[in-house]
Amino acid sequence: AQAGPSRAYERLGLPLGKYLGAIAVFRVTLVFAWYSSVVGWTLRYIFAPLDAAFWKDPAAFFSSVASGWQSALFAVITIVLTGLIVMFGIRKGIEPVVKYMMIALFGILIILVLRAVTLPGAIEGLRFYLIPDFSKLTPRVVLTAMAQAFFSCSLAGAPMVVYGSYLRKTDDTPVSAITTAFGDTTVAILAGFAIFPIALTFGISPKAGAGLLFVSLPHAFKQMIGGFFFATLFFILAFFAGLTSTVSMLEVSTEALLQYTNMSRKQAVALLVTIISLLAIPIALYGVIWNYARYFVLYSGPLVAILPPIALYWVYGAERALAEINNGAAIKLGKWFIYWGKYVYPAGILAAYLYNILG
C-alpha cells in the first residue's frame, strides 16, 4: 500500500479503514507521551554516576528522578531529540541515526557482556539464564513472551506498517523480516548475558522489573571495579534502545499528518512535539491523563493488532498478499504462508493480547 495505517487500510479496501487506522495512530501517540518519561529516565541516568546521591542511595535517587520536575524535563528532552531525528525523514534522519546507534548499542553491549561474564559469581547468573525450568513454562508465560515479541518487533503495530511503506517493490521482504527478527533477538540474548550475571553476582533478584534497572543494578555497579564507566555505558545503551522506539512512534504520527494535511515534515513534527510534550508533562508529574489513557491503550491493543492481517489476508486477498511478499524475494514463500497469515498469525496475536488484558 506504500502508506501509513489509515491510508494503507483504505487502499487495501478495509471498511472504515481510514478511521481504524486513525485509532492505531492515536494509540501510538498516547504510548509515546507516556514512554517518553521512561526513556527520559535512562537519559538522566547517563549523567547519574557524576552525582554522589546516585551511589549513596539508588532508591532515593530513582524516586527523585521518576517523579517531579526531573521526570518531566527529561521526557520533554527525549521528545525534542526524537523530533529532531524524525524531522529529517527516513533516509536522511531516522535511517543513518538508527544505524549508528545500533552499531554503538552492539559495541557497548559486547563490552558489558565481557565484563559481566568475568565477574566472580557470573556462573550462577549464566546458569539461571541458560538452564530452562520447564515446570515454569505455563500458557501465561508463553503468551506473555508472545506479547513481548509483538511489542519488541512492532509486529502488527503501526510503526511496522509505516516503515514497511518505504520498502521498494523489488526489496526482499522475507529477508528483511528475518533480519529484523534476528537482530532484535540477538540484542535481547546479549542483554541477558550482560544483566543476569551482574544481578546474581551481587544478590539482586532478576524479577525486580524497573527496580532492577534503576535501583538494583546501580548497587551492583557500585561494587564493581570500573563501576562508574560501566554504569555510564549501560545507561547510554538503555537510552539508545529506547530512542529507537520513540523515533518509530513519532514517525507514525508524522506520516499521518503528512498524508492528510498540507503540512511540511518540519511543521508536522514541530506540532506533534508540542502536543506530545503537553501530554507528557502532566503524565510525568502526576500520572494524570495516563490513568485514563492507559485503558484505551490496553483495550484497543487487540483491535489495532488484528487490523493488518485482516486487511492484508482477508480483505486484500491472501493470494495477492503472498504475490506481493514474494515479489523480489530470493526464496519464495510457499502456499503454507497463506494459512499462516489468515489463521495462525491473527489467532496468536489475539491470544497474546486478550490473555494479558484478562489476566
Predicted features by range, described:
Residues 39-66, 166-170, 175, 179-187, ...:
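Helix-loop-helix connectors at the membrane interface of multi-pass transporters/channels
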Residues 5-23, 36-91, 120-143, 208-214, ...:
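Inter-helical loop and helix-membrane interface segments of multi-pass membrane transporters/permeases
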Residues 95, 99-243, 267-268:
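Membrane-embedded translocation segments of transport machinery
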Residues 68-73, 183-191, 228-231, 240-243, ...:
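Loop-to-transmembrane helix boundary motifs in multi-pass membrane proteins
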Residues 20-25, 67, 260-273, 295-357:
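C-terminal membrane-solvent junction of multi-pass transporters and transport-like membrane proteins
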Residues 1, 7-14, 23, 41, ...:
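Transmembrane helix-loop boundary segments of multi-pass membrane transporters
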Residues 1-14, 36, 198-205, 311-318:
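Juxtamembrane transmembrane-helix boundary signature
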Residues 27-40, 157-164, 180, 209, ...:
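Membrane-helix boundary/coupling elements in multi-pass transport proteins
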